[in-house]
Curated annotation (Swiss-Prot):
Its EC number is 2.7.1.158. A motif (EXKPK motif) lies at residues 136-140. It is found in: Cytoplasm; Nucleus. Keywords: ATP-binding, Cytoplasm, Kinase, Nucleotide-binding, Nucleus, Transferase. The lineage of its organism: Eukaryota, Metazoa, Chordata, Craniata, Vertebrata. GO terms for biological process: inositol phosphate biosynthetic process; positive regulation of transcription of nucleolar large rRNA by RNA polymerase I. It comes from Rattus norvegicus (Rat). GO terms for cellular component: cytoplasm; nucleolus; nucleus. Its main location: cytoplasm. Phosphorylates Ins(1,3,4,5,6)P5 at position 2 to form Ins(1,2,3,4,5,6)P6 (InsP6 or phytate). InsP6 is involved in many processes such as mRNA export, non-homologous end-joining, endocytosis, ion channel regulation. It also protects cells from TNF-alpha-induced apoptosis. This is Inositol-pentakisphosphate 2-kinase. The EXKPK motif is conserved in inositol-pentakisphosphate 2-kinases of both family 1 and 2. It catalyses: 1D-myo-inositol 1,3,4,5,6-pentakisphosphate + ATP = 1D-myo-inositol hexakisphosphate + ADP + H(+). Belongs to the IPK1 type 2 family.
Length: 489
């Protein structure tokens, strides 16, 4: 970043999460990411610089090793003119969702992260003059807990995402329960993956956003957002997926375009184009491979059919590697929490050891190597407890990451394009796949995760599961005196 050339009018609001806000440059394929804080919890410039540097180091030394260097973009910490930051903050304030305005942009330190704009193809430094589509998916946790430490039997049958949906709707976070289940997407079975992606398109919540030429065209900020319009989305997608049957408008065209999008995303997600060391973890999938709450599974069950369990993900694909990192959570939060308390007790007695234990960094090769210890035999030491706590933090990071898929039609006769290509009904599409939202989850959030887990399971058990039991019981009573009649065929 060249200080003398910073003009807030060249930047626009791009989006924000719970802890940071992103602005994008109009011409260059870069974004700036600023930290956010509650008004009463400001940080010093030194603390903010260290926080941002930790994010960069964790991406570079841990997640890039696990997921592959082509997928992970670490960026760099930059220092910006304070006047530019203040003017930029004023410029974008009106574009921020009301639900995100409880935290303020850091305008005092001047530090930010400069990263590539992942809504663009990751080859050129400047915006290309051809249409570029980007699909952002937050897939969430792709497995059901298999730990013996789980006390709620329901957690061995229903995934966390599906249970959490009911609590989120009850508390007004979202208006409607999504039919999406992460286990369907991670199954590797194309039928289940198609259903999962269609469900995300129908009820995006904060798990799916679509950009066209860097501009958001489809997504949901919160419960106040307007209902998703698939017809309008299909209109945007025509330059990429004009249906091969020639239909130019109407419901059939919309269905054809959406179907084409789903098929292309599935093929990209199953593609293997990069190496990473997550395969070295060799964490075999244990426990249930089908979530009982998945509408896809329920529908087949009502038809008397079995859910196609698991075709298996190709080992080199990003979903497989992401799932491997997620499965570093071998104990579930229930089994992990007593180990967290062991570490806490040790730190209360020896607070000066916090730095030695690398709880706040540095996130270097030493930190990474300790994550590879997959033993689950508790020897009662602080070292064992700490390893499991750090693995849990990394696993939670992978459970909350986002996958960015950028697509662009190949130019006629272009042979120099080195990016992977996937066919569609209209043309070949060059694509790039990236991962973002890879900040290591804070050590301090573990007690919150423990309480939230209990709240989610308790609500689901008392409402949804209890209701299902009542329905099953009623059905049984209705058919207690039935007679089975056999007809000769």
């Amino acid at each position: 970043m060249e200080e003398g050339k910073m003009d807030e009018n060249e930047w626009s609001y791009h989006g924000e999460g719970n802890k940071s806000l992103v602005v994008a440059h109009a011409q260059r394929c870069v974004v700036l990411r600023f930290l956010k804080f509650p008004p009463n919890k400001k940080k010093t410039s030194e603390e903010i610089l260290q926080h941002l540097q930790n994010i960069v180091d964790f991406g570079k030394n841990v997640m890039k090793d696990f997921l592959g260097e082509n997928y992970v973009h670490c960026g760099e910490v930059v220092q910006l003119p304070l006047e530019f930051v203040k003017q930029l903050c004023l410029k974008i304030q009106c574009e921020r969702p009301e639900s995100r305005c409880d935290k303020d942009l850091d305008t005092l330190s001047g530090y930010a992260m400069c990263l590539p704009n992942l809504t663009r193809l990751q080859t050129f430094p400047f915006a290309e003059h051809r249409p570029i589509l980007c699909v952002e998916i937050k897939p969430k946790c792709g497995f059901i807990p298999f730990s013996n430490g789980v006390t709620h039997e329901m957690k061995h049958k229903v995934c966390r995402y599906c249970m959490h949906q009911h609590l989120k709707v009850a508390t007004g976070k979202w208006k409607k329960i999504s039919k999406y289940c992460p286990l369907d997407l991670y199954s590797g079975n194309k039928q289940r993956m198609h259903f999962a992606l269609k469900s995300l398109l129908q009820e995006a919540q904060n798990n799916l956003r679509i950009f066209k030429n860097g501009e958001l065209i489809y997504g949901c900020a919160d419960a106040r957002s307007p209902v998703a319009d698939l017809k309008a989305l299909a209109h945007h997608l025509k330059p990429f997926f004009f249906p091969s049957n020639g239909l130019a408008s109407g419901p059939q065209c919309t269905r054809a375009v959406i179907r084409e999008l789903v098929h292309v995303i599935t093929r990209v997600l199953l593609s293997t184009s990069d190496k990473g060391r997550a395969g070295a973890l060799r964490l075999g999938l244990q426990g249930a491979r089908v979530c009982e709450a998945s509408p896809f599974s329920r529908s087949l069950h009502h038809q008397g059919k079995n859910t196609p369990e698991h075709s298996g993900l190709p080992k080199g694909c990003l979903l497989y590697k992401t799932l491997q990192v997620q499965m570093l959570d071998q104990l579930d939060i229930e089994g992990l929490y007593p180990l967290y308390n062991r570490v806490e007790q040790y730190l209360e007695e020896f607070p000066e050891e916090r730095k030695t234990l690398q709880i706040d960094g540095p996130y270097d090769e030493v930190f990474y190597q300790k994550l590879l210890d997959l033993s689950t035999e508790d020897d009662g030491t602080v070292a064992f407890a700490l390893t499991k706590v750090q693995q849990y933090r990394v696993a939670m990071t992978a459970k909350d990451c986002s996958i960015m898929i950028a697509l662009s039609p190949c130019l006629q006769g272009a042979s120099s394009d080195q990016r992977p290509v996937i066919p569609s009904s209209r043309s070949r599409l060059a694509f790039s796949v990236s991962v973002l939202d890879l900040d290591l989850k804070p050590y301090e959030s573990i007690p919150h995760q423990y309480k939230l887990d209990s709240k989610i399971v308790s609500y689901y058990s008392k409402t949804v599961h209890a209701k299902d039991d009542t329905v099953r019981s009623t059905r049984f009573k209705e058919h207690e005196d039935c007679t089975l009649v056999l007809h000769k065929v």
